[in-house]
From Swiss-Prot:
Domain of life: Bacteria
Organism of provenance: Koribacter versatilis (strain Ellin345)
Lineage: Bacteria, Pseudomonadati, Acidobacteriota, Terriglobia, Terriglobales
Protein name per its UniProtKB record: CinA-like protein
Family: Belongs to the CinA family.
Record SUPFAM superfamilies: CinA-like, Molybdenum cofactor biosynthesis proteins
């Protein structure tokens, strides 16, 4: 059984308002074993909304319309869904009385346009809104021998969440066959999206009862696994079995099998090994320290960090010899190593990290272009240093650099 979510409001098609309701309802539906197959955002047009509603009702068993139930002329969800269903709106006298009562309790005269909130699609069940003036509606029907469950929900998140949790969730759950969804997320570093897919596709395509989605961002690839079954044990067993096979194939490139971030994993290993870490950063400007300290409890292992942006600070705070900078340049393998080793010694930490590079958009040369970064990680056994040439803008280069640094630390610890 699949669901479709339709978010309504022209403001959601601008950069100024985000649709957070869809994320919330997707999570709640997944908990019930329902897959959300489609999401739509529609502006305040009766014709456009009616067209989207017809398509949604034709292809999805469960359709949730969010927003457009207010009193103003651009609140058109009731009318558009009625158009799509070929039904009429009827003004409900009980809702009219409730509206008058609500406004009277506030000693406010009710505007005439609020009466529109008492209009109900023929045959719909009214869903009381305890947190606002716009009631929801529920319509149960059938199309081509398949059930249809249609909800009209208010747009304000606090109203929608309360209405769903207290009323709609139970209404839908009582009508659904029992199903459970289990999920796992594997997070991978050091490998690109196409490389990961080439290696794991022969494995995950064998699992017809598990949906696998691959997502990529700078320095990381995620495999999202989802299985639906009659019992939670069956669903969990399916994703666990596939996750184990994928982890065997990708080996230490997998840094998390339950969705933890790279900085969380590094923190876990540092605590497990009673280790500490300090960082001396140039081009990342403190981003690595920020990511490490975003983890709760990081004070147990994070000693400190410095942003040594200028050559003077590299010497003053991390003991990088001026002659080394003059001979090799501030962006060099030698300086990255000196930052890591010297700051580790200064802070008496078990691991030191040094990063130097050119984040751009200016400052690059033919020999040392924008995106060139040197990253060094030092411990008592020695120092690893890498040269990377990252693509993208300043923000992307800084993120890539911090991601590679964290992964180098992780591999030192495992």
């Amino acid at each position: 059984m699949i669901a479709e979510i339709v978010a309504i409001g022209s403001e959601l098609l601008t950069p100024f308002r985000q649709d957070t309701n869809s994320l919330y309802l997707t999570q709640r539906l997944n908990e019930m074993g329902v897959e959300v197959a489609f999401k739509n955002i529609v502006g305040d047009s009766r014709a456009n909304l009616a067209s989207v509603a017809r398509t949604a009702i034709a292809r999805s068993h469960i359709v949730l319309f969010m927003g457009g139930l207010g009193p103003t002329e651009d609140d058109l969800t009731r009318e558009a869904v009625a158009d799509a269903l070929g039904l009429r709106l009827k003004r409900n006298p009980d809702l009219v009385a409730e509206l008058y009562k609500r406004f009277a309790s506030r000693r406010v005269t009710m505007p005439d346009n609020n009466m529109r909130q008492a209009d109900v699609i023929a045959g719909a069940e009214i869903i009381q809104n305890d947190n606002g003036s716009a009631p929801g509606q529920f319509i149960e029907g059938e199309q081509d021998g398949q059930p249809r469950y249609i909800f009209l929900l208010p747009g304000p998140p606090h109203e929608l969440k309360a209405m769903w949790n207290e009323k709609c969730h139970h209404t839908l759950r009582d009508r659904l066959p029992r199903a459970y969804i289990a999920t796992r997320e594997l997070r991978i570093s050091s490998l690109g999206e196409s490389t990961v897919d080439a290696r794991v596709a022969p494995i995950y395509t064998k699992y017809k009862n598990v949906d696998t989605t691959i997502l990529a961002k700078p320095g990381e690839v995620s495999l999202h696994l989802k299985s639906r079954a009659a019992t939670m044990e069956q669903a969990q067993a399916a994703v666990d079995q596939l996750a184990a096979e994928l982890e065997d194939e990708l080996d230490d490139a997998v840094f998390s099998t339950n969705g933890e971030s790279l900085e969380q994993i590094v923190g876990y290993y540092l605590q497990m090994r009673s280790g500490t870490i300090s960082v001396a950063e140039s081009c990342t400007g403190g981003l690595l320290a920020e990511r490490l300290t975003n983890v709760s409890g990081s004070s147990r292992y994070f000693i400190g960090g410095v942003v040594v942006y200028s050559n003077q600070m590299k010497t003053l705070l991390a003991d990088v010899p001026p002659l080394m900078i003059e001979e090799h340049g501030a962006v060099s393998r030698q300086v990255a190593v000196a930052l890591a080793e010297n700051f580790r010694e200064i802070t008496n930490s078990t691991i030191g990290v040094g990063i130097t590079g050119i984040a751009g958009p200016t400052g690059g040369t033919e020999d040392k272009p924008v995106g060139l970064v040197y990253i060094a990680v030092a411990d008592e056994l020695g120092t690893d240093v890498v040269e990377r040439r990252f693509p993208g803008d300043r923000e992307r280069i800084r993120w890539w650099s911090s991601q590679v640094a964290l992964d180098m630390v992780r591999k030192k610890l495992i």
